[in-house]
Amino acid sequence: MFACAKLACTPALIRAGSRVAYRPISASVLSRPETRTGEGCTVFNGTQNGVSQLIQREFQTTAVNRDIDTAAKFIGAGAATVGVAGSGAGIGTVFGSLIIGYARNPSLKQQLFSYAILGFALSEAMGLFCLMVAFLILFAM
């Protein structure tokens, strides 16, 4: 219905409805008595019909939708950057375990160190992946 209303709209109707588009939707609807015509379209004081009300509603809700989308981007990016802190905790755990393992069995120094480097690389990769997702949410969407 909305697509049909956008196609049936004339430029004169848009100009007539643009004066009211600056008012909040509640003030525009409540301040005019509504009457029904025979064709089923709504007329407000003989100058506006349902099509101009749809145009007005679209004009006023796009700013709200844009603000909601921006807030959702920031919330998602903030949640994704929590993974970077998890990466730091993982690196600390890996090297803490390396020190404990070396204290228990010093003869396994080379094998423990290679496992620690592998754990460091995996933990750092996950942190960088979380940071990349945060930047993608902010700048690519």
Curated annotation (Swiss-Prot):
- Tell me what topology the record assigns in the membrane: Multi-pass membrane protein
- One term under GO cellular component: mitochondrion
Q: Which GO molecular function entries does the Swiss-Prot or TrEMBL record give?
A: lipid binding; proton transmembrane transporter activity
Record-annotated site: Reversibly protonated during proton transport: 124
Instruction: Identify the Pfam families for this entry.
Output: ATP-synt_C
Name the cystine pairs. none
Q: Which residues cross the membrane?
A: 82-102, 117-137
* Localization per Swiss-Prot or TrEMBL: Mitochondrion membrane
Record key words, sorted: CF(0), Hydrogen ion transport, Ion transport, Lipid-binding, Membrane, Methylation, Mitochondrion, Transit peptide, Transmembrane, Transmembrane helix, Transport
Kindly identify the disorder that the protein's record connects it with: This protein is the major protein stored in the storage bodies of animals or humans affected with ceroid lipofuscinosis (Batten disease).
Q: What is this protein called?
A: ATP synthase F(0) complex subunit C3, mitochondrial
Q: Which organism is it from?
A: Bos taurus
Lineage of the source organism?
Answer: Eukaryota, Metazoa, Chordata, Craniata, Vertebrata
